[in-house]
Amino acid sequence: SNVLGKRTTTKDEELLSNLLNSKTVLACYNTTDPKITLAQSKDFDSYKLYLADTGLFTTMLFNDKSEVYSDIYIKLMGDKLDANLGYLYENLIAQELAAAGHDLYYHTWQKPNSTHYYEIDFLLSQKTKLVPIEVKSSSVQYHDSITEFAKKYSDRTGEQYLLSQKDV
C-alpha cells in the first residue's frame, strides 16, 4: 500500500483488516475521481490511517516523561505548545467526521508542471455537492489545495471548510 510505501502482502492486508475491525483506527481512502458518490472511485490501495481515539493519541504523543506531561497538556489546551500539530488536528477532525457517520475520503492530484501534489484532507458528499475540508496546523494564509479544488471541480463543489488550530 502507499501508506507503507511498499507493495502489500496478504499478511499486511490481514493486519489492516484486524485494525479496522477492532475500531481502533479509521481509514481515509483516496477518491481518484471525486463525484457525489465518492465510493465509486475509492482507491483501496491509497489510504491514510487515523487513531479512533484522539485523547489516546494525544497521551501517546506526549507521555514520554510523566513529570512534563501535565505542563505539555496545559500548553496544548491553551494553544501555546511550540510544535507542528497538524497530524493531531487532522486526527481530531477524522474522529469527529467518523462519529457523525461520514465515511472518510481525501483527494490528491498532481500540480501542473510539477512533481508535487495538491491534497484535500477530507472530502464529504452532501446532497448534490462535494464539501472539501482542509486542516491547517498554523498559517491559513496558504490554502492552494482547497482553492484549486474549487476551481477544478467548480460544477460540483459546495461549501468549503478551512480549519486551523484556532477552530479546533
Regions found by a protein language model. Give the residues of each.
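Conserved helicase/translocase motor-coupling segment
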Residues: 1-18
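A cross-kingdom feature that marks ATP-driven nucleic-acid transaction machinery
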Residues: 14-17, 21-168
